[in-house]
């Protein structure tokens, strides 16, 4: 939408007015503004995003985590841990760790083990998903 495009250029202004728009427009604005803010610095991104409602923060954090998962998985994991909604947080962490474990399994497993936001059963579930993913990728087909 045109409003989302404006958010790419004027993220602070658009986020300050976020409550004036419908939920689907808010989501697009948040995504575009997140990219624009993160280009400046991660600190700018976090400062502005922290002023949003919890639901809108979750959208921004999930988007940013997905964006970082290929280039900076540790930071992606850290951002995913900021998500308030437990189900969304778990999905985002699992997604990040699945990508991360493809090129640095040890670091991914360490991040899971060190997380204070994941329960023991969630840690076990994510770890087993990684093991299954790695096992299936090591199968040699005739």
What are these model-predicted stretches?
Residues 1-142:
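Non-catalytic all-alpha helical scaffold/repeat segments
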């Amino acid at each position: 939408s045109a409003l989302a495009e404006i958010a790419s250029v004027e993220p602070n202004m658009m986020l300050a007015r976020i409550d004036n728009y419908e939920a689907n427009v808010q989501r697009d604005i948040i995504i575009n503004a997140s990219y624009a803010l993160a280009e400046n610095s991660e600190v700018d991104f976090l400062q502005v995003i922290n002023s949003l409602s919890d639901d809108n923060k979750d959208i921004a954090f999930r988007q940013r985590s997905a964006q970082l998962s290929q280039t900076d998985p540790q930071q992606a994991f850290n951002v995913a841990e900021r998500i308030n909604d437990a189900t969304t947080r778990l999905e985002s962490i699992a997604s990040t760790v699945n990508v991360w474990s493809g090129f640095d399994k040890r670091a991914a497993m360490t991040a899971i083990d060190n997380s204070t936001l994941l329960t023991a059963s969630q840690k076990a579930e994510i770890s087993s998903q990684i093991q299954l993913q790695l096992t299936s990728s090591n199968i040699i087909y005739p």
